A protein has these predicted regions:
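Midchain, well-structured core segments that form catalytic/ion-binding scaffolds
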Residues: 1-92, 119
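Generic alpha-helical structural signal
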Residues: 9, 59, 63-66, 101-104, ...
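Active-site-adjacent substrate-binding region
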Residues: 9-19, 62, 88-136
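Zn-dependent metallopeptidase/amidohydrolase metal-coordination segment
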Residues: 31, 112-163
């Protein structure tokens, strides 16, 4: 039979995972296939995500992924179906916006550094920005983010609450 996991594994081995470049990340997070150890798996389903500060690069990575899976499937007379959903589009809040200046002022009052950074994370703010509403995402201070060792501290949570109080 046609070994779907074999084709999928070959495709995954050709993909660049993690930080593809400074603006884009790519991850295959789940792989499911097969029904028993003595049966050739005729289906394999993978899920993953692409995040990028540049929407065009995200779409380009989707097209590249589809091409690679199709090529590897064709090598063993299988088929590949790649579906994608756009959950969010990257945005940038201007440094001169009221959101930024209010944030920096609150941080100064509290003695916090008020560091502005980019993030590959998604939030409700992506939807707000898409609809012309400027804002910032205030981090809860995650360590080892998106790993099995992810955590935060009570102190970081407390400081976050202080900052929110100052902004209100």
């Amino acid at each position: 039979g046609i070994h779907a996991i074999f084709a999928a594994a070959n495709a995954v081995s050709r993909l660049c995972m993690g930080h593809v470049d400074e603006e884009t990340t790519f991850n295959i997070g789940t792989i499911q296939g097969g029904t028993a150890t003595n049966i050739v798996p005729d289906c394999c389903v993978l899920t993953g995500e692409i995040r990028s500060y540049d929407h065009g690069k995200a779409l380009e990575t989707v097209r590249m992924t589809e091409r690679i899976f199709t090529e590897e499937a064709q090598k063993i007379n299988a088929t590949a179906e790649v579906t994608s959903q756009i959950h969010l589009i990257a945005y940038e809040t201007p440094l001169e916006s009221k959101s930024v200046t209010d944030f920096q002022k609150a941080c100064e009052i509290l003695g916090f550094s008020g560091e502005l950074t980019g993030t590959f994370g998604g939030s409700d703010n992506n939807s707000f920005a898409k609809n012309g509403i400027e804002g910032l995402v205030l981090s809860n201070g995650m360590y080892n983010a998106h790993s099995t060792r992810e955590y935060t501290t009570v102190d970081d949570l407390y400081k976050g609450a202080e900052l929110i109080g100052q902004l209100i």
